[in-house]
Amino acid sequence: MAAGVAAWLPFARAAAIGWMPVASGPMPAPPRQERKRTQDALIVLNVSGTRFQTWQDTLERYPDTLLGSSERDFFYHPETQQYFFDRDPDIFRHILNFYRTGKLHYPRHECISAYDEELAFFGLIPEIIGDCCYEEYKDRRRENAERLQDDADTDNTCESALPTMTARQRVWRAFENPHTSTMALVFYYVTGFFIAVSVIANVVETVPCGSSPGHIKELPCGERYAVAFFCLDTACVMIFTVEYLLRLAAAPSRYRFVRSVMSIIDVVAILPYYIGLVMTDNEDVSGAFVTLRVFRVFRIFKFSRHSQGLRILGYTLKSCASELGFLLFSLTMAIIIFATVMFYAEKGSSASKFTSIPAAFWYTIVTMTTLGYGDMVPKTIAGKIFGSICSLSGVLVIALPVPVIVSNFSRIYHQNQRADKRRAQKKARLARIRAAKSGSANAYMQSKRNGLLSNQLQSSEEEPAFVSKSGSSFETQHHHLLHCLEKTTNHEFVDEQVFEESCMEVATVNRPSSHSPSLSSQQGVTSTCCSRRHKKTFRIPNANVSGSQRGSVQELSTIQIRCVERTPLSNSRSSLNAKMEECVKLNCEQPYVTTAIISIPTPPVTTPEGDDRPESPEYSGGNIVRVSAL
C-alpha cells in the first residue's frame, strides 16, 4: 500500500492543479482490493480521525476528481475497511457537500491558503465555487497574493546585502529599506524633512504678510518674499528630482515603476516648478500656471513612503473598491432623483434658488451627506417634505458600506501588525543565532574546561585513576560519545589548554608514561558499550619546545579539513607554521575546521616476554593532528 501511495502522489498533485502529468509511462494501476461491492455501496471516509459516510454513487458523479475515480483505492485500508486521508476534516465537510449537492462553497472563517491546498489535493478547481462565494473567494485570494508579495519584497529588502549584489540593487534596497545603512537612513530623514518643509511653505506663502513699500494692498507672503520662497521651493524640488531619478535608475522594472501610483505622485509634485521656469510673462499663460501650482499639494502624499498608516489606508481603499463603487453609484442615483423632485417642488416659488436641476444638485449633495450649509433651503411644503426624505435616505445610503470599510481596515491593520511582529521576531532570532555562532567555539571550550574535561589527573605507579565531576545528562552523553570514539578509533581527545600544559610537563619532567586527562578515557564514567582497541598512551610533545628538546619529533605534520559538499580532504605540509600559500589548495568552497586536538599513538612495542612497554621519548614517526581554528 505504501508503495502504491508513493507512486500515485506526483500524479495526483499534477492533476490537482490542472497540469498533465509528465511521465514516460502511464499511471500505475491502483492496488486491487479483494472485496465485494454492491452497485450502491456505503463508503466510509476517515479524515484525520473524523469519519464521514456517503454512497459510492455520490462520489462517482464526478469521476475526474480524487474521490470519484479509482485513485481513491490508494488510500484504502483493508484492516479497517476505510479510506484514510490525513487532511483537514473541517474543510473536507464542504468538499463532501459538493459531491452531495453539486455546489461548492467557501467557508469565510477558513484560511484561503489551506482551502486552496485541500481543493488541489482532492482534484477540485476553484472555478466551480458557487456564485454566492466566488467573488469573496477571489477577493481573499487576491489580497493574500498581494500580501505575500509584499512580505516577500520586504524580506528581500530587509536581508543583509550579498556580495553578489550590484550597485543598482544596493541603491534600490537602500530606498526600500532605509535601515540597511547609515547613508540610506540619513537620506530617508532628509527627504522626509524637505517634504514637510515643502508642504508648510505651500501653505504659508498664501498668508497675508502686510503691504510692501509703494503698495497699499496687503500682499501674501509668497509675493512679498518671492525670492526666499523661490529658493526654498528650488531646494525641495532638487531633492525630489534626485530622489526620483535615483529610484528610476535603480528600479528592478522601470516600466512598472513609472506606472506606479507613487511615481505619478512624484512627477506631479515636481512638474509645476519646471513648467514655471520656462513660462513667459503672458497673463493668460500665468493664469494657467497658477492653476497648475495647485498640484504642489500632492507632495503631501509623498509621506505615504514614511507612514505605515497611510499605506494601510491605501490598501483598505483598494480592497474596498467594490463597496466604494456601490456607494458612489447609489449616491449618484439618489442625487439625480431628489434634485429633479426638488426642482419641480420649488418651481412655483418666486424666491426659490432651485433654478435648474443641476443647481439643485448642490442642495441634494449637502443634504444627503448631512452637512446642511443653509445657503439653499426649500420654501414650499412639498419641498420641505422631499428634503426630509432626502436627508434620511442619505443617512441610510452612506451608513451601509461604512461597516465593511471599517472591517477591512481593521483586518488589514492587524495583518500588518502581525507581519511586523513576525519580522521583528525573525530579526531577533537571527541576531541570537549570529551571537551564538560567534561565541560557539569559546563557549564549547569553556564548557569542556568547566565540566567536560576539567578532571584532576591522579597518577600512580600501578594504574592511573581519574576523578570525575558530576555533570548534566548532556555532559554525560558527551563523555560517553568521546569514550566510544577513543576506544573504536584509537584516538584520544584532549583540551587544547590541557594539551599545552601536558606538553610543558613532558618537556621538563621525563616520566615513563602519562595519560591525557580526558573524561572520555575514564573507567566507570560510562558503560562499556564499544569494543576497545589495544591502546597505549604516550607523551605529547609541545610544539613550542626548542629543537634540542624535541629530538627527532616531527612537528604537526597533517591537518584534516572537511568540506561540506565533498569527501574529507587533507592538506599536508612540513610545518603548520608555514603559510597557506606553500600548501596544496583545498578543493572545496566551504571548508570548516572543528576545535579539537587529536593524538594518534604509534603501535606499542612488545617485549620478548610478551608485555607491552612504552616507546622511547623520541617518538620517531609519531603523527599529531592539531586543529585549533574554527
Swiss-Prot record:
Keywords: Cell junction, Cell membrane, Cell projection, Ion channel, Ion transport, Membrane, Metal-binding, Phosphoprotein, Postsynaptic cell membrane, Potassium, Potassium channel, Potassium transport, Synapse, Transmembrane, Transmembrane helix, Transport, Voltage-gated channel, Zinc
Quaternary structure annotation from Swiss-Prot or TrEMBL: Homotetramer or heterotetramer with KCND1 or KCND3. Associates with the regulatory subunits KCNIP1, KCNIP2, KCNIP3 and KCNIP4. Interacts with DPP6, DPP10, DLG4 and DLG1. In vivo, probably exists as heteromeric complex containing variable proportions of KCND1, KCND2, KCND3, KCNIP1, KCNIP2, KCNIP3, KCNIP4, DPP6 and DPP10. The tetrameric channel can associate with up to four regulatory subunits, such as KCNIP2 or KCNIP4. Interaction with KCNIP3 promotes tetramerization and formation of a functional potassium channel. Interaction with four KCNIP4 chains does not reduce interaction with DPP10.
UniProt organism field: Oryctolagus cuniculus (Rabbit)
Extracellular topology ranges: 207-226, 282-287, 346-357, 378-380
Annotated spans, Important for normal channel activation and inactivation, for interaction with KCNIP2, and probably other family members as well: 474-630
Matches recorded under PANTHER family: POTASSIUM VOLTAGE-GATED CHANNEL SUBFAMILY D MEMBER 2, VOLTAGE-GATED POTASSIUM CHANNEL
Entry superkingdom: Eukaryota
Gene name for this UniProt entry: KCND2
GO terms, biological process: cardiac muscle cell action potential; cellular response to hypoxia; locomotor rhythm; membrane repolarization; muscle contraction; neuronal action potential; potassium ion transmembrane transport; protein homooligomerization
Stretch list, region Disordered: 600-623
The keyword Cell cycle belongs to this UniProt entry's keyword annotation: no
Ranges for region Required for dendritic targeting: 474-489
Chain residues that bind Zn(2+): 105, 111, 132-133
InterPro entries in the cross-refs: BTB/POZ_dom, Ion_trans_dom, K_chnl_volt-dep_Kv, K_chnl_volt-dep_Kv4, K_chnl_volt-dep_Kv4.2, K_chnl_volt-dep_Kv4_C, Shal-type_N, SKP1/BTB/POZ_sf
Residue span of region Interaction with KCNIP1: 71-90
Phosphoserine: residues carrying this PTM: 438, 548, 552, 572, 575, 616
Misc: The transient neuronal A-type potassium current called I(SA) is triggered at membrane potentials that are below the threshold for action potentials. It inactivates rapidly and recovers rapidly from inactivation. It regulates the firing of action potentials and plays a role in synaptic integration and plasticity. Potassium channels containing KCND2 account for about 80% of the neuronal A-type potassium current. In contrast, the potassium channel responsible for the cardiac I(to) current differs between species; it is mediated by KCND2 in rodents.
Domain notes: The transmembrane segment S4 functions as a voltage-sensor and is characterized by a series of positively charged amino acids at every third position. Channel opening and closing is effected by a conformation change that affects the position and orientation of the voltage-sensor paddle formed by S3 and S4 within the membrane. A transmembrane electric field that is positive inside would push the positively charged S4 segment outwards, thereby opening the pore, while a field that is negative inside would pull the S4 segment inwards and close the pore. The N-terminal cytoplasmic region can mediate N-type inactivation by physically blocking the channel. This probably does not happen in vivo, where the N-terminal region mediates interaction with regulatory subunits, such as KCNIP1 and KCNIP2. The zinc binding sites in the N-terminal domain are important for tetramerization and assembly of a functional channel complex. The channel undergoes closed-state inactivation, where conformation changes lead to inactivation through an intermediate state involving breakdown of its 4-fold symmetry.
Catalytic reaction list: K(+)(in) = K(+)(out)
Post-translational modification: Phosphorylation at Ser-438 in response to MAPK activation is increased in stimulated dendrites. Interaction with KCNIP2 and DPP6 propomtes phosphorylation by PKA at Ser-552. Phosphorylation at Ser-552 has no effect on interaction with KCNIP3, but is required for the regulation of channel activity by KCNIP3. Phosphorylation at Ser-552 leads to KCND2 internalization. Phosphorylated by MAPK in response to signaling via the metabotropic glutamate receptor GRM5. Phosphorylation at Ser-616 is required for the down-regulation of neuronal A-type currents in response to signaling via GRM5.
Keyword Oxidoreductase in annotation: no
Record-annotated membrane-spanning stretches: 185-206, 227-249, 257-281, 288-307, 322-345, 381-403
Protein name stated in the entry: A-type voltage-gated potassium channel KCND2
Main location: membrane
Subcellular location field: Cell membrane; Cell projection, Dendrite; Synapse; Perikaryon
